Amino acid sequence: MTLIVTGAAGFIGANIVKALNERGETRIIAVDNLTRADKFKNLVDCEIDDYLDKTEFVERFARSDFGKVRAVFHEGACSDTMETDGRYMMDNNFRYSRAVLDACLAQGTQFLYASSAAIYGGSSRFVEAREFEAPLNVYGYSKFLFDQVIRRVMPSAKSQIAGFRYFNVYGPRESHKGRMASVAFHNFNQFRAEGKVKLFGEYNGYGPGEQTRDFVSVEDVAKVNLHFFDHPQKSGIFNLGAGRAQPFNDIATTVVNTLRALEGQPALTLAEQVEQGLVEYVPFPDALRGKYQCFTQADQTKLRAAGYDAPFLTVQEGVDRYVRWLFGQL
């Protein structure tokens, strides 16, 4: 039976394709927009049955051109939180997603899609409930509005709808994302280019490099998606983070120590890295004051209640694996 992955040449989409391949699934239609042509590299080691441009796909899918489709993993979106073109964002993230959803509902196809923790905006609690949702940018609003649609249609849906609010995802196949790539990716490249990693200094009561995020490995993101794929009776909107807030200092020290280990050098504590100039703190930029989240942490209550009980990688585990993967790509 056919599977479809939108955003298949993107970061999370390509990792889902690869994870499906590792289970023997190759009857996959990959959907994307390859105007940014270098994204093709994310699919070079993957097996797919067909590729379609996103515009052609949604029209053909609505006509049921692909026969029986078991599931759509809808990862395609504009994920640039700095994008200011509201019309583009709403067309790409909201209207397009509605069209894919409508086709899935009409055909009884499982619909697993990418939501975002950006929906929470400046909230201090990260629970999948309306009172904690207050997006700060049009990207977050586009995701929020679609989740609101999902809440309205889910009670009457005859097939699975599962949305995942991704927190700070890092891992292989993100190099095309540029400024929107993970901190781990940028720290890796910065250390190799300059011999040091730069982090923000003290801000809003947090010490240098102590601002925290829920950093989640794309490996775990793919596992959660496949868990729900395997349990089509489970529907809902779920936080998808490690459930653990860790400071940016943890990312930096892990990147530095993993690269040192690859060169046969011993690990250093954060204090030693700072003393040796391997980690440097820069003044917090004025442009980000009042617009910056100093803390995020996914509430996993709903995810665990839905039956996902596997542990999530820590920063130390996941970033170490990722740095070794990046090093192997050089």
Swiss-Prot record:
Enzyme type, top EC level: isomerase
Keyword Nucleotidyltransferase: no
Any one of the GO BP annotations: ADP-L-glycero-beta-D-manno-heptose biosynthetic process
Reaction equations catalysed: ADP-D-glycero-beta-D-manno-heptose = ADP-L-glycero-beta-D-manno-heptose
InterPro entries tied to this protein: Epimerase_deHydtase (IPR001509), Heptose_epim (IPR011912), NAD(P)-bd_dom_sf (IPR036291)
Pathway: Nucleotide-sugar biosynthesis; ADP-L-glycero-beta-D-manno-heptose biosynthesis; ADP-L-glycero-beta-D-manno-heptose from D-glycero-beta-D-manno-heptose 7-phosphate: step 4/4
Cofactor(s) essential for the protein: NADP(+)
SUPFAM superfamilies: NAD(P)-binding Rossmann-fold domains
Gene Ontology MF annotations: ADP-glyceromanno-heptose 6-epimerase activity; NADP binding
Gene3D superfamilies: NAD(P)-binding Rossmann-like Domain, UDP-galactose 4-epimerase, domain 1
Binding residues for NADP(+): 11-12, 32-33, 39, 54, 75-79, 92, 143, 169, 177
Domain notes: Contains a large N-terminal NADP-binding domain, and a smaller C-terminal substrate-binding domain.
Stored HAMAP family: Heptose_epimerase
Protein name: ADP-L-glycero-D-manno-heptose-6-epimerase
